Amino acid sequence: MILLITTSKSLLTLDTETEKLSVIHTAMGLYYGITFSETEIFVAARNNDNPFDYLGKPDEQGVILVFNAQLQLTRKITAPFPLRDMHQIMFFDNKLWITCSADNMVVIYDGNEWQQWYPSPKLADRNSDINHFNSLWVKNNELHLLAHNLGREPSVIYRYNYPDKKLIETIALGNQAHNIWTLDNPQEYFSCDSDNGKVISSTGKKVALGGFPRGVVITEAHYYIGTSDVAERAERDQVSSKIVQFNNDWHQIKAFTITGHGQLLDIKAPGINDIAQAIHKGIKLTD
């Protein structure tokens, strides 16, 4: 299986059979969210002059890089306003959804028009990194948005009806959390409790990984969780990371070590049924 990986410095592929790691794109980091349609792959690139993990530089002008099935860069998508501190992105309902944590907003792009959605009802929370919205997920036509909350309070999953975005409930889960998914029990939400180095669930399950976990692929047989060495933001581009492979009983099978590329931000598996991704299969990579 081929995993797409974003890090501080690079967009990478990892062949889980041969363990071969390849650089697909570099020099536009920090790279973060990965998503795909049936025909294209989208990657969020913050396009900074260095790959430091800033909390949204005032002059940051992030772009969405678009690749084909051969992982060739075909175009770049830019917005008519700054895309700052992009985190996870999602292709859903023929729209590209982009979390922009620095401005406390989610951007929605249908290919023609841009919409800026501010989930917080407080006007004072707009254009300030209050909730640090960082992860998106959809299941059963319900939209889920994760607020990291920067350690000021526990992280929270916001569950919305779609398409009216009417809030159904909030679920506190973890600290400085990333990623959202469920397994067999649709009421048991999982997330990476990044502050405590664990995967946790809303029913109390805990799986220790160590480091700072984020980035998830969930297939029928195996779970892949990314984690990076813990460091201050200005030093995160120098750390090592790894992807830990589990079976579906959460027993570790192996770990793939990644060095020289900084922290790991996201992982995806195009063409593979991945329940942690809004489009569960999507484009298939070709040679």
Task: Describe the predicted segments one by one.
Residues 4-9, 43-58, 98-103, 145-152, ...:
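Conserved beta-strand positions in repeat-built beta-propeller and related beta-rich domains
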Residues 16-19, 68-72, 109-113, 161-165, ...:
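Short loop/turn segments that connect beta-strands within beta-propeller blades
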Residues 23-28, 77-82, 117-129, 169-175, ...:
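Surface loop/turn motifs at the tips and blade-to-blade linkers of beta-strand repeat domains
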Residues 28-38, 83-90, 128-136, 175-182, ...:
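Repeated scaffold domains used in trafficking and secretory/extracellular systems
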Residues 57-70, 156-162, 238-249:
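Beta-propeller blade signature
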Residues 73-92, 99-107, 114-132:
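Asp-box/WD-like beta-propeller blade repeats and closely related beta-sheet repeat scaffolds
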Residues 175-245:
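Loop/turn-rich, solvent-exposed surfaces of beta-rich toroidal or solenoidal domains
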Residues 238-287:
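Blade-level signature of beta-propeller repeat domains, shared across WD40, Kelch, NHL, RCC1
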